[in-house]
Amino acid sequence: MHKGMLVVVSGPSGAGKGTICQEIRKRNPNLFYSISATTREKRVGEIDGVHYYFIDRQQFEKMIANDEFLEWADVYGNYYGTPKKPVFEALARGQDVILEIDIKGARQVKKTYPEGVFVFILPPSISILEERLRKRGTDKEEIIVKRMQMAWEEIANCDWYDYLILNDDLETAVNDLEAVLTAEKLKPKRVNYRVLLEGGVLER
């Protein structure tokens, strides 16, 4: 009945987009969650092929040259990118796909796949965002300062997204994202009317 739908979830570092996406996956096991490739070091608890594909710069640059990314960016000296092939294969199977990427990557996807659904996650406040980043304990002070500057810029330029979700309560934010998925699936452009007619669902 439904075509595969590409959902792009973005937000400042520390806004909680990763946690929200994890909860959505638990509720919707049939969703295809795209795994990004990166050249950054693994953080404690991260698993290669689960959280990211951890590769070296040479391999990443080879993939760029071969046009293997749907989007990619250099973020604070590390490459991040979304491999194109698994995303388009999942969409072709009729699976809905979740991409958790930054705003630069989202803009790239918007140009190449404008029919996607674009969702921006807002933090409760800038001060709480900074507190979350510091609690991580994974970044040096100069990186935290850069992330905060970037957060201001991203929030100031997020009005082109289809949906804005405030993450001041995790369960509410997850419910909001699930409501977005449900509403988008019901839009006429995503419904295959021929299947409805041939299946006898719609009768005169």
Curated annotation (Swiss-Prot):
UniProt cross-references to InterPro entries, sorted A to Z: GK/Ca_channel_bsu, Guanylate_kin-like_dom, Guanylate_kinase, Guanylate_kinase_CS, P-loop_NTPase
A GO molecular function held by the record: guanylate kinase activity
Group of enzyme by EC: transferase
SMART domains, per database record: GuKc
Principal location listed in the UniProt entry: cytoplasm
CDD domains: GMPK (cd00071)
EC number: 2.7.4.8
Localization terms from the record: Cytoplasm
Ranges of residues in domain Guanylate kinase-like: 4-182
SUPFAM superfamilies per UniProt: P-loop containing nucleoside triphosphate hydrolases (SSF52540)
KW Nucleotide-binding (keyword) present: yes
GO cellular component: cytosol
Keywords: ATP-binding, Cytoplasm, Kinase, Nucleotide-binding, Transferase
Described purpose of this protein according to its UniProt entry: Essential for recycling GMP and indirectly, cGMP.
Family: Belongs to the guanylate kinase family.
Protein name as catalogued: Guanylate kinase
Taxonomic source organism: Carboxydothermus hydrogenoformans (strain ATCC BAA-161 / DSM 6008 / Z-2901)
